[in-house]
């Protein structure tokens, strides 16, 4: 009689760990890549510690805590590692491309290190929130509340507490460049997700063939 309950609890744990792991792996991946790029190519790391705290809190720490408590008894499908990487890698790659975009833009437009950091925070926050959106879909009331609250919190911190997070006011051109980058991120990430889904499909077809 207790077996269905045990199965449901097992599914809840695995499904919720998959969601939380995807969020954590985004930061781990892009931090590792950026550290290597900074070591060999870039003069400075693009973020201040307090800025990473803002991004991590709004897109990883707080949402993963509440997502882990959610009742989720859906059947576990696919490979755990591939499922996690399929959600995390597109976001991490978008963050890295965003940082490179800012650094390349700085070669053509005058930017202070503080302005570059502010641009990187906005672009990284956008990428991370889109990953959170992907992790939360399909939406339930709780997931919608989590995503909406974290987005509102991130925007509120940017608008009302810029000094605490070492964010400077951007010039008109810097604002335009940042806006263009933010507008492009959903399309770039969608491309990476589609590429990842094709990889998953090929893996399934190979398994069926065997």
Predicted feature locations:
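Membrane-interface capping segments at transmembrane-helix boundaries
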Residues: 136-139, 188-208
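Small-residue-rich transmembrane alpha-helices that serve as helix-helix interface/gating elements
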Residues: 121-124, 172-187
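Alpha-helical transmembrane segments
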Residues: 128-132, 158, 184-195
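Transmembrane alpha-helices
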Residues: 93, 150-155, 177-184
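Mid-to-C-terminal catalytic subdomains of enzymes
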Residues: 147
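Conserved N-terminal alpha-helical segment that immediately precedes and caps sugar-phosphate-binding
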Residues: 44-45, 168, 190
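Membrane-helix boundary connector in multi-pass membrane proteins
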Residues: 161-173
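Membrane-embedded transport module
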Residues: 1-143, 152-162
């Amino acid at each position: 009689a207790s077996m269905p309950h045990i199965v449901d609890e097992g599914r809840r744990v695995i499904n919720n760990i998959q969601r939380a792991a995807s969020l954590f792996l985004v930061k781990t991946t892009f931090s590792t890549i950026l550290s290597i790029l900074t070591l060999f190519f870039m003069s400075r790391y693009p973020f201040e510690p307090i800025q990473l705290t803002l991004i991590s809190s709004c897109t990883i720490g707080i949402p993963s805590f509440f997502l882990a408590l959610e009742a989720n008894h859906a059947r576990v499908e696919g490979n755990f590692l591939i499922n996690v990487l399929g959600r995390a890698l597109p976001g991490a790659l978008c963050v890295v491309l965003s940082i490179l975009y800012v650094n390349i833009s700085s070669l053509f437009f005058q930017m202070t290190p503080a302005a570059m950091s502010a641009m990187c925070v906005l672009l990284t926050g956008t990428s991370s929130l889109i990953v959170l959106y992907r992790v939360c879909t399909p939406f339930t009331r709780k997931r919608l509340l989590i995503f909406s609250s974290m987005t509102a919190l991130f925007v509120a911190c940017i608008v009302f507490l810029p000094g605490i997070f070492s964010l400077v006011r951007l010039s008109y051109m810097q604002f335009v460049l940042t806006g263009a980058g933010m507008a492009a991120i959903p399309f770039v990430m969608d491309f990476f997700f589609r590429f990842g889904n094709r990889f998953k499909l090929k893996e399934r077809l190979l398994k069926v063939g065997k």
